[in-house]
Amino acid sequence: MLKGIDPRLNADVLYVLRAMGHGDYLIVADTNFPSDSIARETVYGDLLRMENITAGEAAEAILSVYPLDTFVDDFACRMEIVGKPDEVPPVQQEVQDAVDAAEGEPRKMIGVERFAFYDMAKDAYAVIQTGERRFYGCVMFRKGVVPPDA
């Protein structure tokens, strides 16, 4: 156990979040996402797990230590609902709320078509599978930078 670090972040997840560099991106996936097979194609190459928590809870924990990229529009993306690309289901709204809280202001996640999201995920640094059972609980976070102390 460590002080000041969200206990939902296990050692493997913390290692990967720290190892990632500016512009690398992370997939946070629900239980229905083909996480294991896609994770094998990522930079890290193994599936990470944050089981027994929702996508929103995972996002909250991850974003407590992980800076989002402020230089790009696609700092965070969500998998679009097939046939309803503009609809944001509650599971994605919970993640959006975590993003807004971490950023201190509203920053809207960009929608990505389902199969395009799968393709994007293969180029990610890593995939974290959560315990989220609601459909479309899949998002991407692009890593930003931590500025130097003033």
Predicted regions and their residues:
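Conserved phosphate- and dinucleotide-binding cores of soluble alpha/beta proteins
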Residues: 4, 70, 145-147
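Long, hydrophobic N-terminal alpha-helical segment
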Residues: 1-51
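Glycine-rich, aromatic-bearing surface loops/beta-hairpins
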Residues: 83-150
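Flexible, glycine/charged-enriched surface loops at secondary-structure junctions
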Residues: 69-77, 105-111
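A phosphate-binding glycine/aspartate-rich beta-alpha loop in the early core of alpha/beta enzymes
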Residues: 41-73
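Conserved active-site and cofactor/substrate-binding residues in soluble primary-metabolism enzymes
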Residues: 4, 8-12, 21, 53-57, ...
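Short, glycine/charged-rich beta-strand-loop motifs at protein surfaces that mediate ligand recognition
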Residues: 46-50, 78-87
